[in-house]
A protein has these predicted regions:
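Positively charged, solvent-exposed patches that mediate nucleic-acid binding
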Residues: 1-108
Length: 108
């Protein structure tokens, strides 16, 4: 199971953490309590496009997260951000970029 990030303290900690970018998406990672499930949030700004495009990108990011859920560290908090290039990226490109980002987080 994957939880949503809802508390302000976690968002503040994530924004002060180091950001990694691979292709059209970026990821900020914060280790946490391994007894809890991983927590995920998505940031898709207006620079990506109109609401229809932003929602499509967000749905694709959620689907890619579910495809890689075994790679998420228990208790960790992840913030995935989408840049303007994400609007024209295919699901396969977003999925590959997320896989690379999660592999980098695994090594740290």
């Amino acid at each position: 199971m994957i939880w949503k990030i809802r508390d302000r303290a976690t968002f503040d900690a994530l924004t002060s953490s180091r950001r990694r970018r691979r292709g059209p998406i970026s990821m900020t990672f914060l280790p946490g309590d391994p007894s809890l499930p991983p927590r995920v949030a998505y940031a898709v700004g207006r620079r990506v496009g109109p609401a229809v495009v932003r929602n499509r990108v967000r749905r694709r990011l959620r689907a890619a997260t579910m495809a890689h859920r075994a790679e998420l560290q228990p208790g960790a908090a992840y913030l995935f951000g989408a840049g303007p290039a994400a609007s024209s990226a295919s699901f396969a490109e977003l999925d590959a970029a997320m896989g690379e980002l999660l592999a980098v987080a695994d090594r740290s």
